[in-house]
Amino acid sequence: MTDKIRTLQGRVISDKMDKSITVAIERKVKHPIYGKIIKRTTKLHVHDENNECKAGDLVEIRECRPLSKTKSWTLVAVVEKA
């Protein structure tokens, strides 16, 4: 059983927690009736072991086992500093 590990890129919107960040994932979807492409945003709590991220950074994250009630993603790399 080879499951592909989910990785996403997003923008850090909060780094006020210890060893945790909040990342906004933006995706574009087509409206079911009107057909217009619209933006949808999902907020995820991400584990940041070394507190290396600041608000505004572009980061790559991957899914992992649940670390707390709301955290099941971990930081892979900082793609671009703010």
UniProtKB/Swiss-Prot annotation:
Cross-referenced InterPro entries: NA-bd_OB-fold (IPR012340), Ribosomal_uS17 (IPR000266), Ribosomal_uS17_bact/chlr (IPR019984), Ribosomal_uS17_CS (IPR019979)
Taxonomic superkingdom: Bacteria
Keyword DNA repair recorded: no
Keyword annotations: Ribonucleoprotein, Ribosomal protein, RNA-binding, rRNA-binding
Entry-linked Gene3D superfamilies: Nucleic acid-binding proteins (2.40.50.140)
PROSITE patterns: RIBOSOMAL_S17
Molecular-function GO terms, alphabetical: rRNA binding; structural constituent of ribosome
Cited Pfam families: Ribosomal_S17 (PF00366)
Record-level GO BP terms: translation
Transmembrane regions listed in the UniProt entry: none
Function according to Swiss-Prot or TrEMBL: One of the primary rRNA binding proteins, it binds specifically to the 5'-end of 16S ribosomal RNA.
Family note: Belongs to the universal ribosomal protein uS17 family.
Subunit structure: Part of the 30S ribosomal subunit.
Record's protein name: Small ribosomal subunit protein uS17
Originating species: Aeromonas hydrophila subsp. hydrophila (strain ATCC 7966 / DSM 30187 / BCRC 13018 / CCUG 14551 / JCM 1027 / KCTC 2358 / NCIMB 9240 / NCTC 8049)
